[in-house]
């Protein structure tokens, strides 16, 4: 892992352009601020190309997608590619409907993605291994999600990050298993979307997108652990507030001390 990456992030304050869903847009903006980056939420087809030209990273999240939004994502993504701005794709619910699956694949074919972040079923489906989605919750169809993630990473020359009890991050060659996190994180809707924003924030200051993604997952998981241990937490509502505070109060020293990562 890149030491002091959080310190660099907070010094540089990368601008993260989001084209994201209407369910979690406010939380994604605030978690981006809490980690030390700057959010901008711009969806209009007429302005996304101009907006991404000022950004350090671009998030494409299909959680509440429309055909017009997918068009805006592709336009922004192509502009980001020309400008060498990292693009992070969150294929929320890929496999749940044809629109979500086809839109995810269309974006992957037309835009050079830097990081794909999804749950096991989303990644398994995009890797061609099958899977089951109920709403946007998942059950992988792959016997070995690590291999499915590596296959997808190699197919698109991209970092693939699979969130779960143990998170898996791979660039097709390197692979990391992150064991930070807490079950309480699953009681708050949008934690996956917020994690994507944190991944983008780190990718905005580190060109090794594998290392940046590992650092983001570790930081996010540690904040969840620390929030869950707080005496202020009585349930999902107080957990969410405390989680934001723990993201804000993270330091490189805390990350180094509490990280749980294994590499292959």
Swiss-Prot record:
One of its GO terms (biological process) is thiamine diphosphate biosynthetic process. Its EC number is 2.7.1.50. It holds the Pfam family HK. It is an enzyme of class 2 (transferase). It comes from the Bacteria. ATP binds at residues 117, 163. One of its GO terms (molecular function) is magnesium ion binding. Keywords: ATP-binding, Kinase, Magnesium, Metal-binding, Nucleotide-binding, Thiamine biosynthesis, Transferase. It catalyses: 5-(2-hydroxyethyl)-4-methylthiazole + ATP = 4-methyl-5-(2-phosphooxyethyl)-thiazole + ADP + H(+). Pathway: Cofactor biosynthesis; thiamine diphosphate biosynthesis; 4-methyl-5-(2-phosphoethyl)-thiazole from 5-(2-hydroxyethyl)-4-methylthiazole: step 1/1. Its cofactor is Mg(2+). CDD domains: THZ_kinase. Substrate binds at residues 41, 190. Belongs to the Thz kinase family. HAMAP family: Thz_kinase. NCBIfam families: PRK09355.1 (NF006830), thiM (TIGR00694). Catalyzes the phosphorylation of the hydroxyl group of 4-methyl-5-beta-hydroxyethylthiazole (THZ). This is Hydroxyethylthiazole kinase. It comes from Thermoanaerobacter pseudethanolicus (strain ATCC 33223 / 39E).
């Amino acid at each position: 892992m890149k030491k002091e990456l959080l310190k660099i992030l907070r010094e540089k304050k990368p601008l993260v352009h989001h084209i994201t869903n209407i369910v979690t847009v406010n939380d994604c903006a605030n978690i981006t601020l809490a980690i030390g980056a700057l959010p901008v939420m711009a969806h209009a087809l007429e302005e996304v190309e101009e907006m991404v030209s000022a950004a350090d990273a671009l998030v494409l999240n299909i959680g509440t997608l429309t055909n017009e939004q997918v068009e805006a994502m592709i336009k922004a993504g192509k502009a980001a590619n020309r400008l060498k701005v990292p693009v992070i794709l969150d294929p929320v619910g890929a496999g749940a409907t044809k629109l979500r699956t086809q839109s995810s694949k269309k974006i992957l074919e037309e835009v050079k993605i830097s990081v794909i972040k999804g749950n096991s079923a989303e990644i398994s489906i995009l890797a061609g291994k099958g899977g089951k989605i109920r709403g946007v919750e998942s059950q992988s169809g792959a016997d070995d999600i690590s291999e499915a993630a590596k296959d997808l990473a190699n197919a698109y020359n991209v970092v693939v990050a699979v969130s779960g009890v143990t998170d898996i991050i791979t660039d097709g060659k390197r692979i990391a298993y992150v064991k930070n996190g807490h079950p309480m994180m699953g009681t708050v809707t949008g934690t996956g979307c917020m994690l994507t924003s944190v991944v983008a924030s780190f990718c905005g200051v580190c060109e090794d997108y594998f290392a940046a993604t590992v650092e983001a997952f570790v930081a996010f998981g540690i904040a969840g652990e620390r929030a869950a241990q707080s005496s202020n937490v009585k349930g999902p509502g107080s957990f969410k507030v405390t989680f934001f505070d723990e993201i804000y109060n993270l330091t490189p020293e805390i990350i180094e001390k509490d990280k749980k990562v294994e590499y292959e």
